């Protein structure tokens, strides 16, 4: 019995160390890409692997907590995080929803890419296989079950995958990755267009 307990303890310590090393490695890689722009292609699948939808657009991220997510096809939409609030704009219905950043990211580990707050990491387990990192939520009630980030040989983010708790998942493939995009200064500022309804949930 003592031998079994000892083996169990060793395995637990070893697995904890592996998690810590994987998390530290991922944190460092993300810190090294604190500013980047890219084009994204998204494919959404149901729990059985059937393709549901494709989308594409442009992504701009500046850590901490600033990003501009512009979907251009098949329908246009825009998500802007200014470091404090998140603005979700749907031009088709002429409505924008304003959320507190902490509320908007509650159910998505995407904040780990855009943010740098260590307190978020305690809610996730991290495993690593080469340049692929899988971030799994410890909270079984969250909408997002896991989040996978893949880096290329230049340590640029080449892809990330999001799996929902109910089995549906999305693949995001990044291209035209640029660590030195030229910023005009207003990329992370959202101004409500004239005639657009505001749904303020802050």
Swiss-Prot record:
Sorted keywords for this record are: Chaperone, Periplasm, Protein transport, Signal, Transport
Q: Which GO terms describe its biological process?
A: lipoprotein localization to outer membrane; lipoprotein transport
Q: What is its main location?
A: periplasm
**Compartment(s) of residence:** Periplasm
Q: Which domain of life is it from?
A: Bacteria
Matching Gene3D superfamilies: Lipoprotein localisation LolA/LolB/LppX (2.50.20.10)
SUPFAM superfamilies documented for this protein:
Prokaryotic lipoproteins and lipoprotein localization factors
A Pfam family of the record is LolA
Q: Where is the signal peptide?
A: 1-20
List the GO cellular component terms: outer membrane-bounded periplasmic space
State what this protein does.
Participates in the translocation of lipoproteins from the inner membrane to the outer membrane. Only forms a complex with a lipoprotein if the residue after the N-terminal Cys is not an aspartate (The Asp acts as a targeting signal to indicate that the lipoprotein should stay in the inner membrane).
Family listed: Belongs to the LolA family.
Q: Which PANTHER family match?
A: OUTER-MEMBRANE LIPOPROTEIN CARRIER PROTEIN
Subunit structure, per the record?
Answer: Monomer.
Question: What's the protein name?
Answer: Outer-membrane lipoprotein carrier protein
Which source organism? Aeromonas salmonicida (strain A449)
């Amino acid at each position: 019995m003592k031998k079994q307990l000892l083996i169990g303890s060793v395995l637990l310590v070893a697995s904890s160390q592996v998690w810590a090393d994987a998390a530290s490695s991922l944190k460092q890689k993300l810190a090294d890409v604190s500013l980047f722009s890219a084009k994204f292609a998204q494919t959404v699948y149901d729990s059985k692997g059937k393709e549901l939808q494709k989308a594409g657009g442009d992504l701009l991220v500046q850590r901490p907590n600033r990003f501009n997510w512009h979907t251009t096809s098949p329908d246009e939409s825009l998500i802007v995080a200014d470091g404090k609030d998140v603005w979700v704009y749907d031009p088709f219905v002429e409505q924008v929803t304003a959320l507190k950043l902490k509320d908007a990211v509650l159910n998505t580990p995407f904040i780990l890419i855009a943010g740098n707050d260590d307190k978020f990491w305690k809610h996730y387990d991290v495993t690593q296989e080469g340049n692929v990192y899988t971030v799994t939520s410890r909270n079984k009630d969250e909408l997002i079950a896991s989040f996978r980030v893949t880096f290329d040989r230049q340590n640029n983010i080449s892809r990330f995958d999001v799996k929902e708790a109910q089995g549906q998942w999305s693949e995001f493939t990044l291209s035209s990755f640029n660590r030195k995009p030229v910023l005009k200064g207003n990329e992370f500022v959202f101004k409500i267009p004239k005639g657009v309804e505001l749904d303020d949930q802050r």
